[in-house]
């Protein structure tokens, strides 16, 4: 049996969950509908690779004077669901767009289409593509950050923490 000092009282096990749910309810987070772009400029389904039709990104440019800092958003979904137009991506690009950031939402090959490390290859290819296109689209490549949610957080970390050659040497390696 577990020592008494390591046991968690049954009421304490549910307290964090209850606090989380109460806080989320207090925020009154209504679903984010697929509303039309309400400012700035949007460029949809820009191809950043040629391995798959899934290799695209959306670019949202603010109304503020360019070049704007760029935030790259990578969607979650456990590597098996969602895309660059997911609810999380819509919430984030709207938040940052309203504060003067350019946002790129990156789509990548899911596990049902390609094996590991395809998603990492795709996100890194998108980052390289975006790094080369700042003048074309009007964002500042010197002020770029990457952010992800769930599986997207893992992919963002891999893109940020691996050198440029890692997962880049063989095109379409994850097929």
Task: Please name every model-derived segment.
Residues 9-66:
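N-terminal cap/lid segment of alpha/beta-hydrolase-fold proteins
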Residues 78-81, 103, 129:
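Serine-hydrolase catalytic-loop signature spanning alpha/beta hydrolases and amidase-signature enzymes
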Residues 85-104:
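Short amphipathic alpha-helix adjacent to the substrate-entry channel of hydrolases
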Residues 125-175:
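Primarily recognizes the serine-hydrolase "nucleophile elbow" in alpha/beta-hydrolase
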